[in-house]
């Protein structure tokens, strides 16, 4: 694909949105393949009966409260999974026994067409999507009625009890709302090749946006400019936008995990935590980079302080070692524990943590003291949602149960797969690996106030040393990783480490 360069003027300064080294993009490329019906078949195979009707509504147009303006449209992900349809006000049914996928599109509305353009029609939908039949919405009620009358003993599978199709109240329908979500989650957690390509494309857009920010960072005075350029590049590359609210936290704001105000000046601050990911065809990327603010660096150095460099190096080690452990059959919670083990080792070396007289390292583990600085899970599933669905939990593995009983591991659980009962990683899963270390003033002050209590984390903290690191704020590094049979594949190409620093300083 041919690369290209576009420059824009920001606050009187020429900004190159696509610096040298950015991945080229073919903006004319379209995602021509739609696996919706294959997904419907996969879901049906997980249901308790191989007969029945699956019904799913798409996202309907909804007005904001006390307004005539529609809320921003986001397609329901379960509906999208079996249709590939990104238009509002649609519905779908899948007759399992007949292997028949029927899409229902909005009835034609002449007035609406004049104002907003034509809605998705039957002919267009038949050409664009892998469905067997397309009807207008007005046909849905009669179709469901006739199917139910012909199959009175078979279930209509629905996702939630409040997502039933509109049907006559005088007719009894056999709705089943317990099985479909479990079946769809089991399918969604294992990505097929098409889904992997979409996640990788979202990552390519994210990588280009992160690269652009690093190359132009010396121009920026405010967090808003960082967040704004990220969205600018995503939209320019035909992404519909970001998969979640951008986090562009400078200084102490980087110690707030989901900081989204993005409106404070960069002056006088050391680091930025930028957690920002593009979406492509409803699939998410989730990428975090932490980098120095050039105006805070002097004397030919790369880092604003020795403390910032040290914390970045620790988090970099945490991520590299954890990614190397990602493979099929591995328990992700064990990898999460390894990240905490590295944090414990390195924070003891820096003197941030201490082992008081009469205590042992095991006491620090039991107190979960590293959670004061690393308070979140190592990662989560990624797919149609940034925090994507997970498979059903199983029993806690024996080896983890023994370690927990002996006090040899942290027992704090987070979002799956960062739980004791999460099943092992499987080929086709896409997970994030996002270790971080944070110096959150509120958390530190609370630990200091409780340090004399018998079970407190503060007993093991050198607060005088911690004060030297507070201005770092936080450091998080996050990549999206595909689990494979023989290891893993990192889908994220946003610069980090030396490549990141070279871009910032124009080397």
From Swiss-Prot:
Stored InterPro entries: Aminopep_P_N, Creatin/AminoP/Spt16_N, Creatinase/aminopeptidase-like, Pept_M24, Peptidase_M24B_aminopep-P_CS, X-Pro_dipept-like
Record-listed E.C. numbers: 3.4.11.9
Listed name of the protein: Probable Xaa-Pro aminopeptidase ARB_01886
Ranges in a coiled coil: none
PROSITE patterns the record matches: PROLINE_PEPTIDASE
Organism in which the protein naturally occurs: Arthroderma benhamiae (strain ATCC MYA-4681 / CBS 112371) (Trichophyton mentagrophytes)
Family: Belongs to the peptidase M24B family.
KW Manganese (keyword) present: yes
